Amino acid sequence: MPHHYILTLFGLLPVATNISTWWNFGSMLLTCLMLQVLTGFFLAVHYTANINLAFSSIIHITRDVPYGWLMQNLHAIGASMFFICIYIHIARGLYYGSHLNKETWMSGITLLITLIATAFFGYVLPGGQMSFRAATGITNLLTAVPYLGATMTTWLWGGFAINDPTLTRFFALHFILPFAIISLSSLHIILLHEEGSSNPLGTNPDIDKIPFHPYHSYKDLLLLTLMLLTLMITVSFFPDIFNDPDNFSKANPLVTPQHIKPEWYFLFAYGILRSIPNKLGGALALVMSIMILLTAPLTHTAHLRPMTFRPLSQLMFWTLISTFITITWAATKPVEPPYIIISQTTATLYFTFFISTPILGWIENKMMNSC
């Protein structure tokens, strides 16, 4: 056991004995964050935030910089791994009732919003065709804001179109926001351990606890090893698996792709945006697709904390997961039948989960009371 008092406190942290592998994703997210900051720093050393040179600087990093290809692929695929872990982390929180720890949940959603902003700014930086179009399309949504929209968009772009000032400020934001994420993560962990984590049964964990180290630390280490192994296999053998073919071409404002397709981890929100044939309505739906997670602690009406013994909520939860996957897939397709109706149906089902949660809680309470 380490002798430094902070490390000793961390090692002796009391944790419920019955938390499963689903509780490992917090430490995996911390590892992803460290990896992103390290690889991002080495990429920033060689990157040029200039509209004419950005694409060339990425090629230079990949071809000429020693292990530049590794840094670039680790950073790009590491971002996908980050989002896989965070989506599983959120799903686990919804399933096992972790959202009832309100302060921790709210800080977590703030973290998610900051992470999405950071990833979006990073996606624009390579200066590829799809990066340019995604930046133009998404930032242009600000014009839907009444009265202030056009001014806000011009201010964000630093001009009347995406150009050098846009890339410079996006690079600055992409560089600084990870430090905000680190600070928010510290706050998230402090708030979590003030009350303690939940467990699969939703019972009071104070009855039976064990030290975090060595029991849970070694359990975390197993999944961490598997995650890093998966990451290295993907980087080594399938480095372009998440890349869009259009992004291998330098940004050309005179050429428009068939349809805008952001990175896969934005597609569920983009699919919801695209399913509404109105600019302001779509922009509001896009924001609500994330912000509606904040309502989860307020709409929990069931007597039981987790969904472990709540069959109706389980059915709705797995509908949400399948909806999330379907809307992600539909958002990769052109805006034409049948993808339009699929997007609209799945967008409706996505919001239905959060609206139906309190009703299902009341029904399940009645069912339990009648037994």
Swiss-Prot record:
Q: Which Gene3D superfamilies match?
A: Cytochrome Bc1 Complex, Chain C
How many and how are cofactors bound here? Answer: Binds 2 heme b groups non-covalently.
The UniProt entry lists membrane topology as: Multi-pass membrane protein
Kindly give the Pfam families that the UniProt entry links to this protein.
Cytochrom_B_C, Cytochrome_B
- State which residue ranges cross the membrane: 25-45, 69-90, 105-125, 170-190, 218-238, 280-300, 312-332, 339-358
What Gene Ontology molecular-function terms does this entry list? Answer: metal ion binding; ubiquinol-cytochrome-c reductase activity
Q: Which cofactor does the UniProt annotation name?
A: heme b
Recorded GO CC terms: mitochondrial inner membrane; respiratory chain complex III
Q: Which UniProt keywords apply?
A: Electron transport, Heme, Iron, Membrane, Metal-binding, Mitochondrion, Mitochondrion inner membrane, Respiratory chain, Transmembrane, Transmembrane helix, Transport, Ubiquinone
Q: Which residues bind heme b b566?
A: 89, 188
* Residues holding heme b b562: 75, 174
Which amino acid positions bind a ubiquinone, per UniProt?
Answer: 193
Q: Which GO terms describe its biological process?
A: mitochondrial electron transport, ubiquinol to cytochrome c
The domain of life for this entry's organism is Eukaryota
Q: Where in the cell is it found?
A: Mitochondrion inner membrane
Quote the function comment for this protein.
Component of the ubiquinol-cytochrome c reductase complex (complex III or cytochrome b-c1 complex) that is part of the mitochondrial respiratory chain. The b-c1 complex mediates electron transfer from ubiquinol to cytochrome c. Contributes to the generation of a proton gradient across the mitochondrial membrane that is then used for ATP synthesis.
Other comments on record: Heme 1 (or BL or b562) is low-potential and absorbs at about 562 nm, and heme 2 (or BH or b566) is high-potential and absorbs at about 566 nm.
The protein's assembly and partners: The cytochrome bc1 complex contains 3 respiratory subunits (MT-CYB, CYC1 and UQCRFS1), 2 core proteins (UQCRC1 and UQCRC2) and probably 6 low-molecular weight proteins.
- Similarity comment text for this entry: Belongs to the cytochrome b family.
User: What is the protein name for this chain?
Assistant: Cytochrome b
Which organism was this protein described from? Answer: Python regius (Ball python)
